[in-house]
Amino acid sequence: VCNLSAQPDQTASYLHIPVVDLDQDIARQVIVDREDGQYLGHPTTVLLEDGVTILAVYPKGHGRGAIVYRKSIDGGKNWSARIPVPSSWAASQEVPTIHRVIDPLGIKRLIVFSGRYPAKLAHSEDDGATWSELEPVGDWGGIVVMASLIPLNNGKSHYMAMFHDDMRYLTVDGQQAYDEDRKTNNNALFTLFKTLSVDGGLT
């Protein structure tokens, strides 16, 4: 989703993005989670190789908040209760993302990222039955880190992940850099970053 600031008469000739509105199609909607007075949203999911098992993670809050973890074994028609997770997941500061990766030895792994500074990573080697604690990936951070992760076409189980930041979370003093930049620039500069893994997502 993007925000286009051009005038309607300048964009009408080429911006014809089809819209599919399922708001009233209740038969196709599934309530995965609900809690009175609590914002729940921003889920990311991964479909396992059986084609029906879906794992979902999302924050208990708007962006930041404890990571909630749930599972469906029927393609998303029904969902488990909230599944217990390691204690460090309660301190997540950004929307978590979940991905399937396979290392050069053929070991299948699931990884969950949590953003802001420093970016953190947890992993599972039993299809999400158990997880490690969230641990820093490096001396950097970002907003919704690793929203996109793709395998590189080199046959070596290498991956590229991408994220963006507006100065605030890339470094330990990012907020200070951001505040200084606002004194001379009206709008924040968002920068796209990439990071590579050659060990099946562990680093």
Residue spans of the language-model regions?
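C-terminal segment of classical bacterial N-terminal signal peptides
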Residues: 1-5
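Asp-box/BNR beta-propeller blade signature and adjacent active/binding-site loops
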Residues: 7-203
